[in-house]
A protein has these predicted regions:
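Alpha-helical transmembrane segments of multi-pass membrane proteins
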Residues: 120-145, 273, 279, 339-341
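Helix-terminus/linker motif at the lipid-water interface of multi-pass membrane proteins
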Residues: 22, 26-44, 113-120, 176-187, ...
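Signature of the first transmembrane helix
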Residues: 8-68, 72, 234-256
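Small-residue-rich hydrophobic transmembrane alpha-helices
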Residues: 43-106, 140-159, 265-330
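Residue-level signature of transmembrane alpha-helical cores of multipass secondary-active transporters
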Residues: 13-21, 54, 94, 133, ...
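Membrane-interface helix-loop junctions in multi-pass transport and translocation proteins
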Residues: 157, 168-204, 326-334, 340
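Interhelical loop/hinge segments that connect adjacent transmembrane helices in multipass membrane
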Residues: 1-12, 189, 193-196, 205-244
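Short membrane-interface helical motifs at transmembrane helix boundaries
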Residues: 100-131, 321-341
């Protein structure tokens, strides 16, 4: 984190993160495709629940970012003794997030779908999908925190393996559980939800095992550490949550015209992820680099990291936008009709 040049560090650490994000983006599209083959109402239901899943991800990744910042900063200052306490507090925070989100989600999901759709099949399938996702979201919250802990230590490979494993498992299980293949019962959208949960738990097991090898979970859960984690992660949580509210607002507006528009919007945001993979990959990489060097008092490397990040992302987006826009619009238009049959 301190001896390699900033540019080399960014280019070395970013590819595994970007590959994991690419696989996850592909899985999102494949997931929607299989559901659309089963039921058009199911595809609309997934588009409606998508912003709530983003909210769940915002809480998970935001909390993980808080852990990442604290662990990297401690590495920079040489304060390693209390890292185990931060890690233990981070894992507890993941479990706490799960309890809060699962309870709130199960309590309010029926009301959310009642205002988001007037079609009974969409409501029923959406509620069924959401209940499974919320109940089994422990894997997402723990995996996200473990991933950020490993990234804080400069380990980008294990999180990539975990996320790719989870996504591939999800893609394989989707048709089996949705359509009832190989002797499995036909589960429809519930099968898609179960496949998602299975993939998340597979990723959690891989990252949790890697974290255990480093810390052996010897720390103690301390309230002030948990508060520090949320304080460091709250900007990320709030910004991503506002994006979720924006999509929910658009869905409510589009619903007044036709629910097909809501479906198209959901497909659009899943496709849009491909365009932002380089940005999101670099964003995840610079967090531990900046935190480490800030803790070590190396302000020049902090400024250099921000400068190179800005140059790489702006340059990349400007260069790729003209080529991406045309193919993106074509795929969105044709992809909607392919998915709807």
């Amino acid at each position: 984190m301190e001896n390699i040049s900033v540019v080399r560090l960014l280019l070395k650490l970013s590819p595994p993160v970007m590959l994991a994000l690419l696989i996850q983006s592909i899985y999102n599209i494949v997931d929607s495709f299989f559901v659309s083959r089963y039921s058009a109402a199911g595809l609309t239901a997934l588009s409606i629940i998508f912003p709530i899943q983003l909210l769940m991800t915002a809480l998970a990744t935001g909390t993980g970012a808080g852990i990442n910042i604290l662990v990297s900063r401690m590495d920079g200052t040489g304060e390693t003794k209390s890292q185990a306490d931060i890690v233990k507090g981070g894992l507890f925070s993941g479990f706490f997030n799960y309890i809060i989100f699962a309870c709130a989600g199960l309590l309010f999901i029926r009301g959310y779908f009642s205002i988001s759709s007037d079609q009974l099949p969409v409501q029923e399938q959406g509620i069924q999908y959401a209940q499974i996702i919320f109940t089994g979201s422990l894997g997402l919250f723990i995996e996200s925190n473990c991933t950020k802990i490993l990234q804080a230590k400069g380990n980008m490979l294990t999180p990539m393996i975990a996320q790719v494993t989870g996504a591939v498992m999800n893609i394989i299980l989707d048709p089996i559980l949705i359509f009832g293949m190989f002797g499995m019962p036909e589960s429809g959208v519930a099968g898609a939800a179960l496949a998602t949960i299975a993939g998340q738990f597979a990723a959690m097991i891989i990252t949790l095992t890697a974290v255990f090898r480093i810390y052996r979970f010897q720390g103690k859960i301390r309230l002030h550490n948990c508060i520090s984690i949320y304080r460091a992660g709250i900007p990320s949580i709030v910004m991503q949550s506002l994006y979720t509210l924006y999509i929910v607002g658009l869905n409510l507006i589009l619903k007044q015209f036709t629910e097909d528009a809501v479906t198209v919007l959901g497909i659009y945001y899943k496709l849009q992820t491909f365009f932002f993979i380089p940005l999101m990959g670099l964003q995840q990489v610079i967090l531990p680099i900046i935190s480490f060097n800030y803790g070590a008092g190396k302000s020049k490397r902090v400024k250099d990291t921000l400068r190179y990040f800005r140059e790489l992302t702006v340059g990349g987006q400007v260069f790729s936008s003209p080529y991406f826009a045309r193919s993106f619009c074509w795929f969105l238009w044709h992809g909607f009709f392919i998915m709807r049959g």
